[in-house]
Regions:
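Glycine-rich phosphate-binding loop of ATP-grasp-fold ATP-dependent ligases
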Residues: 1-10
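PLP-dependent aminotransferase class I/II
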Residues: 13-222
């Protein structure tokens, strides 16, 4: 919601917590006249320029949250009668007040999408999501944990309609970099990854945009 051009801010419960976090964030150096480390440190410090951006963004925080809540409500209303399509909602227990930074939907496995027969037939040449930088090319378009064919088909369909929709985040334990590590799971996160999709909901997404996105989703369903 507030990125400060890099990832946001961390609010701590105490000065002690803040001090420990900053120790890790500033290379975790021990008090010697040379570099010694008893823990693995990082270099997460925010520049003065980014801090200034963050202070400026705080002025529009309330407006951004209100906009995201409005977009979420509009998606819920426009998609409520579409069979097999479900917008992830806030639990109605009164315990939560989501800022709806991310608007997600799930697609039932039995829902058929136009072009579904071509899902995962070609290797992606660029990073999905407009990510900058260098990507590692792959030989196979499929992995052992991926969105269902209808979700991938809908992503491609929306992209062809000039709408960028992304899969939800792949579970960490299914990332190749963590292959072989211990994991304790009930499988829910893998099921969500198979059926989930993120919808556009940023500050520049208008009511007209949401209606167009919903119309494209409806058009894609067979």
């Amino acid at each position: 919601m507030i990125t400060t051009s890099g990832g946001g801010a961390l609010i701590c419960r105490s000065a002690e917590d803040a001090n420990e976090i900053m120790w890790y964030a500033t290379q975790a150096r021990d008090a010697y006249p040379y570099y010694q480390h008893t823990a693995i440190g990082y270099n997460y410090r925010m520049s003065n320029v980014c801090a200034g951006i963050g202070r400026g963004q705080m002025k529009v925080l309330d407006a951004h949250i209100a906009h995201h809540k409005h977009v979420q409500a509009l998606y819920e209303e426009l998609l409520k009668d579409v069979p097999g399509v479900h917008i992830h909602k806030q639990p109605a227990t009164g315990e939560y007040d989501s800022n709806f930074w991310l608007c997600t939907m799930t697609l039932d496995p039995q829902v058929k999408i136009k072009g579904q027969e071509n899902a995962y037939k070609e290797v992606i040449k660029t990073a999905v999501g407009g990510a900058a930088g260098v990507i590692h090319q792959v030989d196979s378009p499929t992995t052992d944990c991926q969105p269902n064919d209808n979700v991938e088909a809908l992503r491609v369909w929306m992209l062809n309609k000039k709408v960028e929709c992304r899969p939800v985040w792949k579970p960490m334990h299914k990332q190749p970099v963590y292959a072989g590590t211990d994991v304790y799971t009930n499988g829910v996160e893998e099921e969500i990854f198979k059926v989930g999709m993120c919808l556009p909901a940023g500050p520049y997404v208008s009511d007209e945009d949401v209606r167009y996105i919903v119309d494209c989703i409806k058009e894609a369903i067979l």
